[in-house]
Amino acid sequence: MVKRQISMVLDLNKCIGCQTCTSACKLQWTNRNGREYMYWNNVETHPGPGYPRNYEHSGGGFDEEGALKIGITPSAEDYGIPWEYNYEEALMTGTDPWLRPNVKPTWGANWNEDEGRGEYPNSYYFYLPRICNHCANPGCLAACARNAIYKRQEDGIVLVDQERCRGYRYCITACPYKKVYFNEQISKAEKCIFCYPRIEKGLPTACAKQCVGRIRFIGYLDDEAGPVHLLVERYKVAIPLHPEWGTKPSVFYVPPLAPPRIGDDGEPTEETRVPLAYLKELFGEAVVPALETLKTERAKKQSGAESELMDTLIGYRHPEMFKLS
């Protein structure tokens, strides 16, 4: 058992898919030395295959009895082979008239960006940012034969001991979210570290600090004065992704309140544009009361009444969104 668990809440109603969080993480951690294909933070368009491709059907996690399930390791093509461009030939020497990738791209972290489902006027999609969930019951930790993966006692952040890791990749197959990666240059597993050097200095993660939509809240689950406890424990509007996988994520999502469907008469209906059945696939049955609470509190705010929940979700100031002490 860890002493405390640091957690993150992401409000999907505010994410604009700008990829600023992805850029912040990529520039900070994964732009070199065998990490080029890795996106510790990525923003997916849903419904869609995600990153790596079809990770939701790649196995891992735990069954209903708590037994570890071993999945598959995604291929390089499922992640998207990183490429560069022929800048020298196209821009400097003029030996090639076209600027082109040096490999033929077939997939990438945001390959299906802004694609959705449905037909006009009821087509729909939403953005879903993902990092390592720093789970309370990590499949990667349970699978590691070298005891190289551990949770920090002071904050529950899940890390890989690079001295102990031998690159067996069991952690990748056991993580149902496929948020552990293999660095072929050093033959070791690597993953999101929740920017722990920043956390230790009282600073939020790079992805959270750079988020222009202010969708991310960081704090400790047991801090009753913090936004994470309020959203997860008190109002229960922040819920984990795929709770049925049994890893008990420490990253939570406020589900999207989609616009209403438009009926055949051109008028809005009571049905939401994003099907509730699809949201249940992602977040389980807890999404139903979460959405109802959001609707109720939003209506209160619209009527001019006070709403602690809505004021918190607006995120006026960073100090109110990040409680790291």
UniProtKB/Swiss-Prot annotation:
Positions of the 4Fe-4S ferredoxin-type domain: 6-35, 123-154, 156-185
Family annotation (SUPFAM superfamilies): 4Fe-4S ferredoxins (SSF54862)
GO cellular component: membrane; periplasmic space
Localization (cell): Periplasm
Subunit structure: Heterotrimer of alpha, beta and gamma subunits.
Its biological purpose: Electron transfer subunit of the dehydrogenase during anaerobic growth on dimethyl sulfide.
Record's protein name: Dimethylsulfide dehydrogenase subunit beta
